């Protein structure tokens, strides 16, 4: 009898914990979606308005600090950390606003730490340890937005588990078909330094950079074109 009661108690506790976890992440994605819809448009962030009213951003980061996501739930895990990264970038800008570039603040990516997902970590930690080290997913580079003009554009919605595959694909296709991001000229293509910094993510299994890009392009780039990298514009992606 006691074993039966104990089993029921443990089961109820597990279900209660699972429901609480689900509700906390659901609330985070919903609040994040509202935030991005309010302060992002045309790939730019309205930092001035956020600085005047930082309450929603701070509330989101407080929520994110206490959320635990499991890597076994891959889409939820990825969506959480992508949103957490983009929100932390905005927080870093707001904490030092006004600035012309995230690089104006020393250690913006590799020293300043944020309490997210139950741990303290930098922006580089999120990108490299929480995401790149765990998943073979080069499309992350087109949704993690570093706060600079040369970054792929930030979207006016949260990344959500149920829509993540579609969102990753759409943002990658959008970036790689954008003539300002992939600059094709006669016999040459000039591409973002992202492809140089994270080259190993794009050239696996003997694939070339052009080969990777062509998977997502409507107008294919000839494989014999010369590849160069244009300078990264680190000016703030400000609305």
Predicted segments — roles?
Residues 1-5:
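Positively charged n-region of N-terminal signal peptides that target proteins for export
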Residues 7-17:
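Bacterial N-terminal signal peptides
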Residues 18-22:
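Sec/Tat signal peptide C-region and signal peptidase I cleavage site
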Residues 24-239:
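Interaction/scaffold regions that mediate signaling and macromolecular assembly across diverse proteins
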